[in-house]
């Protein structure tokens, strides 16, 4: 009985931690339990004395502070990693949303499913059905990329006329004031037609002058610029990246010095600016330049510090000395992008966005707005492109035949085709879910990094898979090629607005560990403010948090999550339970990693990256489950749900295993392994059988396939190869039973080629009627159009001689 009572006590202690019972109530329960065991004669009643001696200091605040919290507080202040101003502003910026629940070890699934699903307004739907549809029809991507290296003038005019560049601008200034969800839908539709078109529309509606002016501009700046931006009268760009400072924006060498100077014949307070920027989208044609630079005030003319820090200003590009107009040439996807320079240019101090009072506030302004732009534009562009590619590749896999069968029936093709379908579903779920949060008023900085990284990364992998499937059809450029420019341009999305290597290894967990953790940010604030009282309360909540996640990790690992709460009892039930377990694992690993590695965790980028991977996969899986629920839990969609969640579970567990295999403290790694994997690893990647089911969805018209491609431009127009492939798929499927019947009548397995010739012969023999012959003839026309590639006169591929600059510039840092 003594052994059983000890086991029961351990179980009780674990239950108190598991259910996160308060310290005071837990102490009372333990005292009552010990007393009961004493009365029962199992334990000595005198055990209450040492137990009380242990518990009393924890529950009496003055004693607890002096004996425990104060020494820990002093140690914490010593080991707390140093934080630059830009890092602090990045962490303080934005808000925490659903990712905070995932990080805390106990997700509230009811809360997730109660988030309202966005709906398009009548105005937004009309814009998608009208101007967006027409812009897609007008876009000839091969002409844009190969012949013009730009959008045609009539398309530029159409975009300005219908205020495509004003989706984020409020109606009071003449903008459209669309929701984040509507912006995402617009960009997805455009990107399925032309990457250049989507980038051109997306950038002014992302981080740039319009967004910054609405949040921080003076009334005079808003009233002057916003109506002009809304009408397309002004074309904006924003210049942040320098040759010497790409991802490390805090190190920009571009400078501004506050001084008096002459402006329009008068002496005014202003700034002398010097900058050298590159990779600036829309810079070659911009009329107003948003500029980030480091501002100093050596004579203290503004009355504050000498070194004010990063500042943002708006400068008309007509200002004398502004160098603009030259273009970069990004990977044969020549959207308007180029360098801008200025040397010792004087402008009035009022050019600062928000006026002089916002001097030195530029980095905070940028990071507060970046989460919205980065969470919408890049994920939407990548997602829209992959959705269209998924439909087109699935159609091509059905139409294209080798060895007398559709290549889509070959297992070697099914594997990458399933990845394309699964990624399209997951990416759309992830890109949509973040818009829910933005529409609720959140600025989810960590989520925007997750969605940017994983949508662009999965987008690139999916396009590579599509190229493997289509072969020569994807390689040969021309008007009928739906894939090659997306393939060439995929690294662009990977690189911009936080290169993906940096985003994964530093930003996701680097911000998430502090921003999403329930206590660390407040503990750091308490340490900085020398507030031991606040630290005391947080410390013991934090200890309880770690204890809870330790117990939850072990128990849920032992039971494979079977005892944890789930909001549903259907085919997705086990997924919620697995995610409960992984959430507890992540919370435990995060706390232990921060405790053991301290400030060095910042430099242990591969550990940080793997912790970020776990958080990311938890988000992607929960986005899939949310999408499945929002769309009505269609059973036909389950193969995609299974694929998306199983892939996420496998990747998350793999990341944890890799982390533990490489954790520098091997003793701690062993203890963590025992807690997290008490019975070993459990999750497998999607099976061959599941891949078969998912790949099949893309190859025949069905409701699930339509949901994968929801909102894309699928009209079979002259310059829309995706729409033409969709039409060809329908034509070929209509012809297939007729072809099979002819084969049966003739007793031959005829190839699915020369269907027009076959139709004439079968009609002459009375095997089919005229309508069926017409179906076969149309299918042959569509089939040939789908599998053929473009060819050109030799001179059509030559380019004009490139005029080299007279002076060779010094090689800039890579």
Curated annotation (Swiss-Prot):
Decide whether keyword Cell wall biogenesis/degradation is in the record.
no
**In this UniProt entry, which cysteines form S-S bonds?**
none
Where does the source fall among the domains of life?
Bacteria
Q: Which Pfam family, any one, appears in the UniProt record?
A: Acyl-CoA_dh_N
Catalyzed reactions per annotation? a medium-chain 2,3-saturated fatty acyl-CoA + oxidized [electron-transfer flavoprotein] + H(+) = a medium-chain (2E)-enoyl-CoA + reduced [electron-transfer flavoprotein]; a long-chain 2,3-saturated fatty acyl-CoA + oxidized [electron-transfer flavoprotein] + H(+) = a long-chain (2E)-enoyl-CoA + reduced [electron-transfer flavoprotein]
Which key words are in the record? FAD, Fatty acid metabolism, Flavoprotein, Lipid metabolism, Oxidoreductase
Which cellular components does GO assign to this protein? cytoplasm
Requisite cofactors? FAD
Q: Can the keyword Transport be found in this entry's annotation?
A: no
The record's InterPro entries line, in alphabetical order, gives: Acyl-CoA_dehydrogenase, Acyl-CoA_Oxase/DH_mid-dom, Acyl-CoA_Oxase/DH_mid-dom_sf, AcylCo_DH-like_C, AcylCo_DH/oxidase_C, AcylCoA_DH/ox_N, AcylCoA_DH/ox_N_sf, AcylCoA_DH/oxidase_NM_dom_sf
Q: Name one GO molecular function term.
A: medium-chain fatty acyl-CoA dehydrogenase activity
Name the Enzyme Commission number(s) assigned to this protein. 1.3.8.7, 1.3.8.8
What induces its synthesis? Is under the negative control of the global regulator FadR and the positive control of the cAMP:cAMP receptor protein (cAMP:CRP) as well as the alarmone ppGpp. Is induced under carbon-source starvation and in the presence of the long-chain fatty acid oleate. Induction during carbon starvation is cAMP:CRP-dependent and sigma(S)-independent.
Catalytic-site annotation from UniProt: 497
Report the record's Gene Ontology biological process terms.
fatty acid beta-oxidation using acyl-CoA dehydrogenase
Pathways per UniProt = Lipid metabolism; fatty acid beta-oxidation
PANTHER family in the record, alphabetically? ACYL-COENZYME A DEHYDROGENASE, MEDIUM-CHAIN SPECIFIC ACYL-COA DEHYDROGENASE, MITOCHONDRIAL-RELATED
Q: Can you tell me which family this protein belongs to?
A: Belongs to the acyl-CoA dehydrogenase family.
Stored NCBIfam families? FadE_coli (NF038187), PRK09463.1 (NF007000), PRK13026.1 (NF009586)
Q: What is this protein called?
A: Acyl-coenzyme A dehydrogenase
Q: Which gene encodes it?
A: fadE
């Amino acid at each position: 009985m003594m052994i059983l009572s000890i086991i029961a006590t351990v179980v009780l202690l674990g239950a108190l931690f598991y259910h996160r019972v308060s310290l005071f109530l837990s102490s009372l329960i333990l005292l009552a339990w010990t007393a009961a065991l004493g009365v029962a004669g199992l334990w000595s009643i005198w055990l209450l004395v040492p137990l009380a001696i242990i518990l009393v200091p924890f529950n009496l605040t003055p004693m607890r502070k002096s004996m425990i919290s104060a020494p820990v507080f002093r140690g914490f202040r010593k080991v707390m990693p140093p934080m630059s101003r830009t890092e602090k502003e990045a962490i303080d910026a934005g808000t925490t949303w659903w990712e905070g629940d995932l990080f805390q070890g106990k997700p509230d699934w009811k809360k997730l499913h109660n988030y309202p699903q966005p709906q398009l307004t009548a105005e937004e739907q009309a814009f998608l059905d009208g101007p967006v549809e027409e812009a897609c029809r007008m876009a000839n991507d091969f002409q844009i990329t190969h012949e013009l290296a730009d959008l045609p003038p009539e398309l530029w005019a159409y975009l300005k006329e219908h205020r495509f560049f004003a989706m984020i601008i409020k109606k009071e200034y003449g903008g459209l004031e669309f929701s984040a969800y509507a912006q995402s839908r617009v960009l997805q539709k455009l990107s399925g037609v032309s990457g250049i078109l989507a980038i051109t529309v997306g950038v002014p509606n992302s981080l740039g002058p319009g967004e910054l002016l609405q949040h921080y501009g003076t009334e005079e700046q808003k009233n002057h610029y916003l109506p002009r931006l809304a009408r397309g009268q002004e074309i904006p760009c924003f210049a942040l990246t320098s040759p010497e400072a790409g991802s490390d924006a805090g190190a920009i060498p571009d400078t501004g010095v506050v001084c008096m100077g002459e402006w329009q014949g008068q002496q005014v307070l202003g700034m002398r600016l010097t900058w050298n920027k590159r990779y600036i989208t829309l810079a070659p044609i911009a009329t107003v330049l948003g500029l980030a630079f480091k501002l100093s005030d050596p004579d203290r003319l503004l009355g504050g510090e000498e070194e004010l820090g990063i500042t943002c200003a708006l400068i008309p590009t007509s200002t004398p000395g502004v160098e603009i107009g030259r273009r970069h040439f990004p990977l044969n996807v020549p959207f308007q992008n180029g360098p801008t320079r200025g040397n010792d240019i004087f402008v009035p101090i009022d050019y600062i966005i928000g006026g002089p009072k916002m001097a030195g506030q530029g980095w905070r302004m940028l990071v507060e707005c970046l989460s919205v732009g980065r969470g919408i534009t890049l994920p939407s562009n990548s997602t829209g492109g992959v959705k269209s590619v998924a439909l087109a590749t699935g159609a091509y896999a059905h139409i294209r035949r080798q060895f007398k069968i559709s290549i889509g029936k070959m297992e070697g093709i099914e594997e990458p085709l399933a990845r394309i379908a699964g990624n399209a579903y997951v990416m759309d779920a992830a890109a949509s879910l973040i818009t829910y949060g933005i529409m609720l008023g959140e600025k989810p900085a960590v989520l925007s990094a997750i969605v940017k990284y994983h949508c662009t990364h999965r987008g690139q992998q999916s396009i590579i898979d599509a190229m493997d499937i289509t072969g020569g059809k994807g390689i040969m450029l021309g008007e009928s090629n739906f894939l090659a420019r997306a393939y060439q341009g995929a690294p662009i999305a990977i690189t911009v607005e936080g290169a993906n290597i940096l985003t994964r290894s530093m930003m996701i967990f680097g911000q998430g560990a502090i921003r999403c953790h329930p206590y660390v940010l407040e503990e750091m604030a308490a340490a900085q403010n020398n507030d031991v009282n606040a630290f005391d309360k947080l410390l013991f909540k934090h200890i309880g948090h770690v204890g809870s996640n330790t117990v939850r990790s072990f128990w849920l690992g032992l039971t494979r999550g079977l005892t944890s709460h789930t909001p549903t009892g259907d085919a997705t039930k086990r997924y919620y339970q697995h995610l409960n377990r992984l959430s507890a694992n992540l919370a435990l690993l995060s706390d232990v990693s921060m405790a053991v590695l301290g400030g060095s965790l910042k430099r242990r980028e591969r550990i940080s990256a793997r912790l970020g991977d776990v958080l990311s996969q938890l988000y992607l899986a929960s986005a899939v489950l949310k999408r499945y629920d929002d769309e009505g839990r269609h059973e036909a969609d389950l193969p995609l749900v299974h694929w998306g969640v199983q892939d996420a579970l496998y990747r998350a567990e793999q990341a944890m295993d890799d982390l533990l295999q490489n954790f520098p403290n091997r003793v701690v790694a062993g203890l963590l392994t025992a807690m997290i994997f008490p019975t070993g690893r459990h999750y497998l990647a999607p099976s061959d059988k599941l891949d078969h089911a998912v790949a099949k969805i893309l190859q025949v018209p069905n409701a699930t396939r339509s949901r994968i491609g929801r909102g894309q431009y699928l009209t079979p127009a002259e310059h829309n190869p995706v729409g033409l492939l969709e039409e060809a798929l329908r034509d070929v499927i209509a012809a297939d039973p007729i072809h099979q019947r002819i084969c049966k009548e003739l007793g031959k397995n005829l190839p699915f080629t020369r269907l027009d010739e076959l139709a004439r012969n079968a009609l002459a023999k009375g095997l089919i009627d005229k309508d069926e012959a017409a179906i076969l003839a149309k299918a042959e026309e569509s089939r040939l159009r789908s599998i053929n590639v473009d060819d050109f006169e030799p001179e059509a591929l030559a380019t004009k001689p490139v005029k080299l600059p007279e002076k060779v510039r010094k090689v800039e840092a890579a």
